[in-house]
């Protein structure tokens, strides 16, 4: 699968990447099958769409069902805020002035892509060494799961719906320039990073887990900051690259938050000069029907009247019961948003790309 964008990563990033002698980042096909009941790993990823880097984990095969994906590409929140016994408080994660320190002790690798785009991401398997013992990192990798309900809602792995949406950005020539964008349940932050590279005036990243923001999203954002001097995707010579202060200035248009959706809403809406989002991007966040009410309320409160939501999802998620059709029915019953299917990917597990807009925008 090729992604074609009209921008490229900074040339100096090559100096920050750790050499991977084993050719870790390659596209591998999946072989064999595993019993669904023996693993909570996402099964049945289509062979031509799973970018299987060691940082992204592996998956077992299946035909029609799926288990919960990464929710910090998917942040889960229960149905009614007031009924939730312990809401995860929201907070903003400040980007350090010295962005180089964000990448210290991080192992970065390039995601496979076309010659027109390169994206570096943290090799998340390396985080096991930084966080030894019992914690959400070790538990996620040891259990082969990207979901520990109420504790860890994903983000250490990137699932194929994110790539589906990135591909759609190119095919549909989605315009980001001048837009205020929210990457909701961001995980790796690839959707928001793409928007930033596309000229968005401001990009916010939200994830359930603060650790995912600090150790995955933030480093990915810093590693992919576009140079203002770039022209037609060609990087300037080393001597003309932006100084650290200029890189920090470029990241100022990005803000990062952690916490549950309801708490995140409270935090940003408490700002006197808060302006709602023109575009909300979200991938694999509708796997659990228990979260639909809070997700719907979040979109209702944060989307501008003429804005739109671009959502990517599996048709159905095995084990939790959520999926596209159930979510569409929920939205229709609320009567606030119109939904439109943009694309159906019928390779392996069926996947959908959807658009949501207000029924009465003005």
From Swiss-Prot:
Keyword Transcription regulation carried by entry: no
Major localization class: cytoplasm
Protein location: Cytoplasm, Cytosol; Nucleus; Nucleus, Nucleolus
GO function term, MF aspect, one: protein-L-histidine N-tele-methyltransferase activity
Chain positions of motif Nuclear localization signal: 237-243
Modification Tele-methylhistidine occurs at: 144
Subunit: Interacts with GRWD1 and members of the heat shock protein 90 and 70 families; these proteins may possibly be methylation substrates for the enzyme.
Reaction catalyzed: L-histidyl-[protein] + S-adenosyl-L-methionine = N(tele)-methyl-L-histidyl-[protein] + S-adenosyl-L-homocysteine + H(+)
EC number(s) stated in the UniProt entry for this protein: 2.1.1.85
Keyword annotations from UniProtKB, A to Z: Cytoplasm, Methylation, Methyltransferase, Nucleus, Phosphoprotein, S-adenosyl-L-methionine, Transferase
Residues modified to Phosphoserine: 62, 67
Uppermost EC category: transferase
Binding, S-adenosyl-L-methionine: 158-162, 185, 206-208, 259-261, 283
Annotated Polar residues bias: 55-73
Assigned protein family: Belongs to the methyltransferase superfamily. METTL18 family.
Cellular component GO terms, alphabetical: cytosol; nucleolus; nucleus; protein-containing complex
Post-translational modification (record): Monomethylated at His-144 through automethylation. Automethylation at His-144 positively regulates the methyltransferase activity toward RPL3. Probably methylated on other residues.
Gene behind the chain: Mettl18
Any single Pfam family the record assigns to this protein: PrmA
Biological process per Gene Ontology, one example term: regulation of ribosome biogenesis
Organism: Rattus norvegicus
InterPro entries assigned to the protein according to its UniProt record, in alphabetical order: Methyltransf_16, SAM-dependent_MTases_sf
Top-level taxon of origin: Eukaryota
Function according to Swiss-Prot or TrEMBL: Protein-L-histidine N-tele-methyltransferase that specifically monomethylates RPL3, thereby regulating translation elongation. Histidine methylation of RPL3 regulates translation elongation by slowing ribosome traversal on tyrosine codons: slower elongation provides enough time for proper folding of synthesized proteins and prevents cellular aggregation of tyrosine-rich proteins.
UniProt region (Disordered), positions on chain: 28-89
Alphabetized PANTHER family for the sequence: HEPATOCELLULAR CARCINOMA-ASSOCIATED ANTIGEN, HISTIDINE PROTEIN METHYLTRANSFERASE 1 HOMOLOG
Presence of keyword Metal-binding: no
Protein's UniProt name: Histidine protein methyltransferase 1 homolog
